[in-house]
Amino acid sequence: MLQATTTISNKLGLHARASAKLTKLAGGFPCEIWMTKGERRVNAKSIMGVMMLAAGIGSELTIDTEGDQAQEALDALLALIADKFGEGE
């Protein structure tokens, strides 16, 4: 299993549009992808699960990937979050 911790830095946090981008990206990989915030762990391929994290700006998330293309998935998700989901703020 691969794991990385990142911080949500876009102004609106992990809102509906950002969650949709994240789950769409995650769904394109065959591996398992989990996200954790505090005590809550969710499947990153589930938009409802991701939105339930209620990750606002400054929230720290841990991403776990396991299986085929785990490294590629982790790198892609970290890049999306670092790019502020393409929102520029």
Region locations from a protein language model:
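C-terminal structural segments of small proteins and small subunits
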Residues: 56-89
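Intrinsic-disorder/low-complexity, polar/charged segments enriched in Ser/Thr/Lys/Arg/Asp/Glu/Gln
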Residues: 1-5, 60
